[in-house]
Amino acid sequence: MFTAVRATLRPNAVACKRCFSSLSVQLKQAGGGKIMTPKAAIADIPVGAKVMVGGFGLCGVPRTLLDEVVKRPELKDLDVYSNNLGTPGRGVGLLAREGRVRSITGSFLGGNREFGDQFFRGEVQLNLCPQGTFAERIRAGAAGIPAFYTPTGYGTAVHKGELVLKYEKKEGEEAKPVLISKPRESRRFGNRDFILEEAIYGDYALIHARKADEAGNLIFHSTARNFNDPMARNARVTIAEVEEIVPVGSISSDEVHLPSIFVDRIVKAELPLEVEKVCLSKPEGDATELTKRDIIAKRAAAELSDGMYVNLGVGMPNLVPSYLSKDVDVYVHTENGLLGVGPYPSREEDVHTDIINAGKESITERPDAAAFDAVASFDIVRGGHLDVTMLGALQVTANGDLANYMIPGKFATGMGGAMDLVSNPDNTRVIVLTEHVDKTGKPKVVQNTELPLTGVRCVSTIITDLAVFNVDREKGGLTLVELQPGVTLEEVKAKTGADFKVAL
């Protein structure tokens, strides 16, 4: 049984009128005694606890607290809730490497193949969940809401109950699923379809913040806020690892991101944070021959207009800003919690551990940027407030179905925020950027796909290294509207796995 007392009980409290006098009243400071050592802060976490771990990749990860958890060899069979699994031996990956995890609930494995291997050997359970849905399930649990309807994932394996959660534990044999996800209830509101998702609840939350006062009011910094804020509101016991502790009164009420009522214990951070991918901008004039990826990104830039709010997915879409004309200024949103992404830093000394994009790359902020937590970020996404989102693809079909996160039987990184990004295509135009054929020469633009879907009838435009197609999402069908320089119609026909009309 897990309990936590968040307030001082006053059995003799009485109602009083709001009145004024010259009487001096001494107020008791709230939250006294919250500051403690890392060892003491995590000492009562039991075997089998549900532990939420904040952070996005390595950004905003409570590194000091995770290090302390590992020092308790008996602390195993943890059900961990973390959007990302860090990297092997770093971030939440440290818990996985040490064999402390029974199950992980999150949206993205990233490059943590160690955990992927454990999953396929049947040693751990993996509950994949779209990133925005994951954030909302945490928020719902914090707010006392047991379930909610979302458009994210409708028509996909999430909706149909086709995700493998655990494999049979056998050595040297092909892995066989022993646990499959449950189908989601669906319902239609207006002219849109939604699925029912249930709230999740944590026993403990291990989070990181920039600053805390002695009462437990917290301030986060830039994209390091991510899942730290909503997880702190959710768990029965929240342990905040902070870079700076200041006296009460040092933080104005308007500056507080997370009120003290949600924070039970405060620990001073002892280990520095890390950047997963240090990326620096190229010097002007450093021209190289355009690759296929560059050709696609350059053409995609022409789809953006001045003043647009856009989300650029991991990989090829991130190249698009480099090819925007000087008279086009767009606001780039990144799902880990920033609107107003700037260029890569020009020097290593300008790299900040708290400022990254969804690909875990170091970035800068525009002067007019705004940072927020994961819940607010996906309010922007799911609510259709973005003008355009650009994503990569494994395959895309003639009716606009997108598959871009999993090839069955192979290592799956997870869907991340992609299912959310394509969940409102009537308000946010979805543009796919992809090479026309895969590494084996097979078409990626196809009539139908057997790959797990990211979204149904969601893609409006397909841009490849050979051509540009418009998609009729309502009736189905492709129209070829443009050929890339030097490409012939015959080549496009030969390398496309779907019928299409021609309107060149």
Feature roles, as predicted:
Residues M1-G31:
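N-terminal mitochondrial targeting presequence
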Residues F20, Q29-M36, I42, G57-K71, ...:
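Conserved phosphate- and dinucleotide-binding cores of soluble alpha/beta proteins
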Residues S22-G31, E198, A297, A301-L304, ...:
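N-terminal/domain-start segments enriched in small and hydrophobic, helix-friendly residues
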Residues A40-K50, I138, E303-M308:
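Glycine-rich phosphate/diphosphate-binding loops that line cofactor/substrate pockets in enzymes
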Residues V51-M52, C59-K71, A297, E303-S305, ...:
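N-terminal low-complexity or amphipathic/hydrophobic leaders
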Residues L78-N83, Y331-E335:
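Beta-strand segments within the central parallel beta-sheet cores of soluble alpha/beta enzyme folds
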Residues G86-P88, M316-P317:
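Short acidic loop-to-helix transition motifs that present clustered carboxylates
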